[in-house]
Amino acid sequence: MKINVNMYIYGLILFHICLFAPLMAHAGNDNYVNNRMPLTKTPFIPLPLGSVNAEGWLLKQLKLQRDGLTGYAEVLYNDANDLGPGCDWLGGAGDSWERAPYYVKGLVPLAYLLNDQNLIAKAQKWIDWSLNNQTRNGFFGPSGNTDWWARMPMLYAIRDYYDATGDDRVIPFLTNYFRYQHATIDSKPLSSWGKSRAGDNIELVFWLYNRTGDSFLLDLADKLKNQAFPWTYIFTHNKFMDFGADFQPKHNVNVPQAMKMPVIYSQKSKNQADIDAYRKGREHLMRDHGQPQGMQCGDEMLGGRSAMRGIELCSVVEQMQTSETVQIILGDARIGDELEQVTFNALPGSLSKDIKCLQYYAQANQVQSKYGGGGFGQGYHNGLTPSAFSGYGCCRFNMHSGWPYYVKTLWAATDDNGLAAMAYGPCKVTAKVADDVEVTIVEDTHYPFEEELRFTITTSQPVNFPLKLRIPSWCKNPVIKVNGAEQIEVNPGEFYTVNRTWNNNDVVVLELPMEIRLNEEVNNSVSVHRGPLVFSLKIQERWVANADYGNGFKEYEVFPETDWNYGLAIDPADLKNVFTVTQSAMPENPFVQSDTPITLKVKAKKIPEWGYSHNNFACDPPFGPVESSQNIEEITLVPFGAENIRLTCFPLIGTPKYTGTIFQENFENDHIDGWVEYNGSFMVNDGEYIATNTEGYLGSKSVQSSTLFSDLIYDFKVKVGDRGDGGVIFRADRLSLGADEYNGYYVGISAADQNVILGKADGNWRLLTSFRMAIQADEWYQVRVEAIGARIKVYVNDMDAPKITYTDYSFSTGCIGVRCYNAITHWSNLHVADASYVSNLKDVSMQKLGIYPNPAKDSINIHYNLVYSDEGELNILNSTGSLILKKKITKGAALFHLETHTFSPGVYACIIKGNKDEIVSSKFIVQ
């Protein structure tokens, strides 16, 4: 028989490919599924669900969840559009969209972590319906809901179910679905939420690829990445606000959820920009929107650093999952610190201590929880009140994955057949190491409520493998002991590796001494940290039940029974012996305020003038340092997560340091510096400050709370869109969320109404007067406000004749800021001067003439004073001596605004000449 040599060789090659397919994964861990080539090798590998089991206080949280919101979810939320028998994810006619998938995503790991047969049976019902009702083309889920996004949480649930059970239906099911998606997504592309959250889909595509090697999956990952928002660009360059009316990239559930996408995709792209996007994005977010509990705020859009801004519970669990995922891929120990800060503070701080209530929003300074929308952009009557039904429906379904995901990712396999502690808490891990040897490590600790962690190894035989322990960045003097022998070169912010032959009952002790740290918060206030825990003022809580849903589930308002308006009477530069740490016996649940095993005591003073806003929030901490004549008291601080009402951002007692003579802002940095936002989403771009978000935020304002002006001259440039109005506020205080939640004056322009507006607010809006004027949308206007005593003048473009002159003295002093109502608004070249400073210029030459800003970009303000002369001239000359501008002036002090955007860059001279031989000059630079 004649043999076709080419076919023989091809068959031989194919045989060897099939035989050695497992070897196409990267050389590394032999016990768990690694990344296949061409995906990059990762330092850590996730362990299957069930490898890690919680113990101690951490197990208690899972049990509380079982006996609380998760275990009773199908009773509480039994509508067909939720989890009832008519739910479309069970074949019914309801419309549950993301809700049932969210719930099942958390239910599956909780059920198998607890090995609870009742929960397992509930989970099986949902999993079976999806697996058994896949159509022939691979589509699954409700036929009336074709949203790609709604399937992503269910895919996570099915993946975890496979890890726990090995059900052989899962791999073909996922393969068929992803083939369908690959064939369909070009004609039915990602949109809206799916476009924001495509990273979840890509993660699951890679998970399947590592098990099957199907090459179409890599192409699908590319399609998903290319259809998603450009998250690498957004995180790298702080461009969350750059998408006009599309709110998706600034939505603060999408943001923490999408933060993992560039890193996930970097496994294929190998692009350094994708790898770096997480760290750069995190730095942007915490600088501009960071809160003490380790989250960026957003209610629901990114919203600055005010301590009254909300953090949505959905964003908390998504931030946790992102940190868990990204640390596996990057191996950056700092990410574990960030994970623990969110997990131990933001998560329990958004739940009642029996986990029978959630809070849709939680605030850093939430001193009471009352009904009312509260001025949030996405406001809900019960958005701050503990309830099984708090706020919008997403959080009550998404929160279930928080604690279970944390537990299942506490440990990971290493790429060299070892184990790594990724985050900490009482638990037990059973996993394979070395050459298929099973070991168990018991992690005995009350961490983060104590400093010591004890790891006991159980093994049936001596076995050599690396054990990696994450050393937190906040720990200055970590200690590791192996069977009593202290290890060397244990460095903060790294994984420390103990590589040795381990014997049964070997013990590793990790000591993490916890020092008090202060973090700067809004208005120069501080938050107090010890280890991964954030501490808040202990406030006696009064819970008032307003609804009863049965089985112990109620809806509450929570009120303070003790004072909360304290500032810390300490020197922040010397914290030694300032705080007294008290530790007590470890309770079953450390997040119960009365039982918490650790408290801090510190000296403080009350600040009587610090109170509630018009809408009953705690006003932001007064700009510090703050004076107080009150007696020193000793106050108690408890962990953030041990309270549902709290004060976390404390002013420091001291001598105030306000800006009250000259303030200028050219917005030259690419980030928000010193501005405190109250509603709306603001950005800085190319020398402009921009309010970008109008949907849900009819009144957006941002202030420089470091300023304190009475009589003032306020110059600024502003342009508004074709609806609403935009301008500035002054003499403002008692600021809060909401269009009119402040005391103070407002001056604005409107292209929609063709007028200039002067009004005031005191919790309600009051129009004082307006002036009819042709205002073009998206065109710059130069505006000046002069407020001297009760007289307020408003100039627009023409600085010689005011458009408005009005008398009102409702407010005498306060900060300055910007505000808009239902308008996309741009500001630039803000300059504020104390009017008395201008009018009191003396006859010393440098006091006769002041130029701000200098150097200038688009405009300057010239303060001048003719002391002896009756009249004179103001002349501007360029560097060659040519006269650029001449203006007649009269005796006295005045301010002249000069547009310089048409000037060539260079040095210019301003010369004041009086008719009595009075002359003064100064140079300025135009950039």
What spans do the regions from the language model cover?
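Short tryptophan-centered beta-strand motifs in secreted/extracellular beta-sheet-rich domains
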Residues: 667, 714-716, 779-788, 792-794
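C-terminal beta-rich recognition modules with glycine/proline-rich loops and embedded aromatic residues
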Residues: 278, 337-345, 350, 356-456, ...
